[in-house]
Amino acid sequence: MKTVTVRDLVVGEGAPKIIVSLMGKTITDVKSEALAYREADFDILEWRVDHFANVTTAESVLEAAGAIQEIITDKPLLFTFRSAKEGGEQALTTGQYIALNRAAVDSGLVDMIDLELFTGDDEVKATVGYAHQHNVAVIMSNHDFHKTPAAEEIVQRLRKMQELGADIPKIAVMPQTKADVLTLLTATVEMQERYADRPIITMSMSKTGVISRLAGEVFGSAATFGAVKKASAPGQISVADLRTVLTILHQA
């Protein structure tokens, strides 16, 4: 399976990489959060732009992205506008969403963008191509905060992301039962062993699903989300604890 290299970070080999989310509402919040994150042990910084109040003004967004890059200079920056329908804070039209991601790509300030699978195939394909022309990697994502689809459906969505050109397909689902967590892990193994030719990221959310955030190296998920201060999704654990567990599993 091929790995994905972003700056000097190789995703898809060794222990799963740790992603943390920055969620400031104003440029002042963004800067203070970035400063607070500087000493934390993580691999990729995700900026959750849907938390940023002034998201429809490209200048403000790019000013904030520049501020993050000045403060955290040594980590890849993942630019993510999570839509309201997939658990995010704000709603944009498809046109606004694509334009925002293209502006981020154009800026040269971000290393990766997150594109939601169900944005529309044509828009997604074109935006993936655009990102790749500018040497920006794409995490393609899907989130279900209500349930865990059947394993076949999870695999199908991950394969679709791969077909649409994602560098890293990602899915997060909500378990209603312990068996749902096994469904997600089963789908992860099947995708990783039978279909994936690139790294994937999967997780089962909430406290019930926390094992999926820790055992990625065993089942085939290449990255996991941790919390520095406030969790960006249910079930995230602190980055320090996360690194300890990932290292134990890696060295076992």
From Swiss-Prot:
Q: In which pathway does it act?
A: Metabolic intermediate biosynthesis; chorismate biosynthesis; chorismate from D-erythrose 4-phosphate and phosphoenolpyruvate: step 3/7
One short Pfam name that applies is DHquinase_I
Instruction: Tell me which Gene Ontology terms the entry assigns under biological process.
Output: 3,4-dihydroxybenzoate biosynthetic process; amino acid biosynthetic process; aromatic amino acid family biosynthetic process; chorismate biosynthetic process
Which keywords, in A-to-Z order, does the entry hold?
A: Amino-acid biosynthesis, Aromatic amino acid biosynthesis, Lyase, Schiff base
GO molecular function: any one?
Answer: 3-dehydroquinate dehydratase activity
Q: What class of enzyme is it?
A: lyase
Classify the source by domain of life: Bacteria
Binding sites annotated in the UniProt record for 3-dehydroquinate: S21, E46, W47, R48, R82, R213, S232, Q236
Can you tell me which residues the record assigns to a coiled coil? none
InterPro entries under this entry? 3-dehydroquinate_DH_AS (IPR018508), Aldolase_TIM (IPR013785), DHquinase_I (IPR001381), Type-I_3-dehydroquinase (IPR050146)
Q: What is its EC number?
A: 4.2.1.10
Family per record: Belongs to the type-I 3-dehydroquinase family.
Any idea what job this protein has? Involved in the third step of the chorismate pathway, which leads to the biosynthesis of aromatic amino acids. Catalyzes the cis-dehydration of 3-dehydroquinate (DHQ) and introduces the first double bond of the aromatic ring to yield 3-dehydroshikimate.
Name of the featured protein: 3-dehydroquinate dehydratase
Q: What organism, scientifically named, is this protein from?
A: Salmonella choleraesuis (strain SC-B67)
